[in-house]
Curated annotation (Swiss-Prot):
Cellular-component GO terms for this entry: mitochondrial inner membrane; respiratory chain complex I
Disulfide feature: none
Species, as recorded: Oryctolagus cuniculus (Rabbit)
Enzyme Commission numbers on file: 7.1.1.2
Recorded topology in the membrane: Multi-pass membrane protein
Protein name: NADH-ubiquinone oxidoreductase chain 6
Length: 174
């Protein structure tokens, strides 16, 4: 399980490397969506199943609106890719090589604690059992969200629905 979290963390960083060296807004939005999905996978690996799914759905809904808006405003007939400019390609390759070097150092050496200190890993645990009893934070939060915050869900869903039509209207050019 540690290797899965380590691999997801590497993919998370690589998504942000792709975002930071974006040649066109289309690829920047794609990098953010990939990083969001991998980040939800990290939350899922620590036991926060419904919390990770809800975070991904809300994040993806908001990102699709922003992604559609930036694509509409910065439409290019021939968008630049990572390989079309030597400087952009060099920065992307440099970021990838730095991440690969860090991964090789962490896997091959015995002193992993030198790079990353895992003393407070209990702060990242979503599902934790004690002698008193177990209460799942994500299920209790979902119950509160649907019982007390039902109008908040309706307003949030309606806002995303209306914003999709706004983005469609902007892209149409009317």
């Amino acid at each position: 399980m540690t290797y899965v979290v380590f691999l997801l963390s590497v993919m998370f960083v690589m998504g942000f490397v792709g975002f930071s060296s974006k040649p066109s807004p289309i690829y920047g939005g794609l990098g953010l969506i990939v990083s969001g999905g991998v980040g939800c996978g990290i939350v899922l690996s620590f036991g926060g199943s419904f919390l990770g799914l809800m975070m991904f759905l809300i994040y993806l809904g908001g990102m699709l609106v922003v992604f559609g808006y930036t694509t509409a405003m910065a439409t290019e007939e021939y968008p630049e890719t990572w390989g079309s400019n030597v400087m952009i390609l060099g920065m992307f390759v440099l970021g990838v090589l730095m991440e690969v070097g860090l991964v090789v150092y962490m896997v091959m050496s015995d002193g992993v604690e030198i790079v990353v200190d895992f003393k407070n890993m209990g702060d990242w645990v979503v599902f934790e059992g004690d002698e008193v009893g177990l209460i799942r934070e994500d299920s209790m939060g979902v119950a509160a969200l649907y019982s007390y915050g039902s109008w908040l869900m309706v307003v949030a869903g309606w806002s995303l629905f209306v914003s999709i039509f706004i983005v469609i209207e902007i892209t149409r050019g009317a």
